[in-house]
């Protein structure tokens, strides 16, 4: 019993000792209530929507950081911190070109601030205003295209709206989503709009919730419809890809049977041994002017889309009088075929093979959609030419192909 009590007392003593030690360690080594010195030799370089400030640091040994306090807009305060290991900080988020006062504070390791050093910045025109000034809207099939320059590379949203009732009530209809981008040139197409003249409104917003003036335009989208697949037919040219037979034939017509998410083997699939770009040819029954198209990839084993023969880089060609007599036609030199475009599938996450995020899966499930270049002639026959699949080879796998146009 005495030994047990001895052990208990010893453990209690050690616990108290350790607890006291922890309290001591959590206490500041020293409290410095003296404010540090001021920054000096302050210089400003004004840029679009922001300013870069350089300065000389005070000589205080316990200087922790420099703080800048300022308002991006009246009543909207923000602060920026810069380590003691740099003499530069950037104040950004300005929504105008007015003069703004920035207060610079030196802060020591105890959190004590110096008095403020005031400097005036005069930011240049913010990126969202530059983008709005360059915004151009043009009617296209089933909607409109929008293009603008974003020379500052800011994170911007172009917000489209439409007055469906003609009474100034601006709304976003189905398919009319915001366009988000930080590219130096922002380009997008909005579809699913009726071919009637209406007023559309556009504004540009940045990540600080600054909004540009609204651009209002009246336009009539070009008539567009989903092409009727019941007239489509297989036409096999001599050097077209050979379809696969593995538990059943993977016929070409599965590309237009209306099933975007088929099981095996109800998908178009070609032999995997191909060593050159492969082609598939379709007779649409009549000539059409194409506006856009969608490819639904096949969901492979393991629940993956961005694998194996699903298209990654490919071309689409058009013709009205293909030469069927040539035993080995070369689409690149055959004058009866015209290249309509080269297309690249982007994996939203950019993750490696067999790693697919929910965004990757949603993009593939909904179908990879592309716009054709404007000004194309009408064509009856099309060829899909696979340049590279997700395996880095040439065989083709497509669950469904859908075309829009007139």
Where are these regions (language model features)?
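Recognizes extended acidic, P/S/T-rich segments that occur
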Residues: 57, 63-97, 162-195, 332-358
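Post-signal peptide N-terminal segment of secreted/secretory-pathway proteins
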Residues: 42-127
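Preference for solvent-exposed, low-hydrophobicity sequence contexts
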Residues: 164-190, 202-244
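Beta-strand-rich modules
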Residues: 89-117, 183-221
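Aromatic, loop-rich ligand-recognition surfaces of beta-strand-rich domains
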Residues: 260-331, 364-406
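Pro/Thr/Ser/Gly-rich low-complexity, intrinsically disordered linker/stalk tracts
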Residues: 21-61, 113-154, 213-236, 404
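Disordered, acidic Ser/Thr/Pro-rich linker "stalks" and the adjacent N-terminal cap
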Residues: 217-285, 298, 360
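C-terminal motif of bacterial Sec signal peptides marking the signal peptidase cleavage site
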Residues: 16-19
């Amino acid at each position: 019993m005495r030994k047990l009590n001895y052990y208990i007392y010893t453990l209690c003593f050690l616990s108290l000792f350790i607890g006291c030690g922890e309290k001591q360690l959590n206490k500041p080594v020293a409290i410095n209530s003296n404010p540090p010195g001021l920054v000096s030799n302050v210089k400003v370089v004004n840029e679009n929507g922001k300013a870069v400030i350089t300065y000389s640091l005070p000589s205080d040994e316990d200087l922790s950081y420099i703080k800048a306090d300022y308002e991006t807009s009246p009543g909207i305060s923000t602060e920026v911190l810069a380590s003691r290991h740099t003499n530069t900080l950037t104040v950004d988020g300005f929504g105008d070109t007015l003069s703004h006062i920035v207060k610079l504070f030196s802060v020591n390791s105890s959190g004590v601030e110096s008095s403020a050093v005031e400097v005036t910045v005069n930011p240049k025109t913010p990126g969202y205003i530059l983008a709005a000034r360059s915004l151009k809207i043009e009617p296209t099939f089933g909607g409109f295209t929008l293009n603008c320059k974003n020379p500052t590379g800011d994170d911007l949203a172009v917000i489209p709206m439409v007055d469906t009732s003609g009474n100034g009530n601006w709304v976003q209809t189905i398919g009319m989503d915001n366009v988000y981008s930080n590219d130096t040139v922002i380009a997008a197409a909005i579809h699913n709009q009726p071919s009637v003249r209406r007023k559309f409104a556009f504004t540009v917003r940045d990540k600080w919730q600054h909004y540009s003036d609204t651009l209002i335009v009246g336009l009539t989208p070009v008539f567009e419809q989903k092409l009727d697949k019941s007239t489509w037919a297989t036409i096999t040219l001599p050097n077209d890809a050979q379809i696969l037979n593995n538990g059943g034939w993977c016929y070409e017509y599965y590309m237009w049977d209306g099933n975007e998410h088929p099981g095996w083997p109800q998908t178009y699939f070609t032999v995997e041994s191909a060593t050159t770009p492969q082609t598939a040819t379709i007779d649409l029954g009549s000539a059409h002017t194409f506006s856009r198209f969608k490819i639904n990839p096949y969901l492979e084993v393991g629940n993956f889309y961005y694998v194996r023969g699903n298209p990654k880089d490919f071309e689409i060609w058009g013709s009205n009088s293909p030469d069927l007599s040539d035993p080995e036609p070369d689409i690149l030199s055959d004058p009866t075929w015209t290249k309509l475009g080269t297309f690249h599938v982007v994996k939203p996450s950019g993750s490696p093979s067999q790693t697919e995020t929910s965004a990757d899966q949603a993009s593939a499930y909904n179908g990879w959609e592309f716009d054709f270049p404007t000004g194309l002639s009408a064509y009856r026959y099309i060829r899909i030419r696979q340049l590279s699949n997700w395996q880095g080879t040439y065989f083709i796998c497509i669950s469904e192909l859908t075309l829009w146009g007139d």
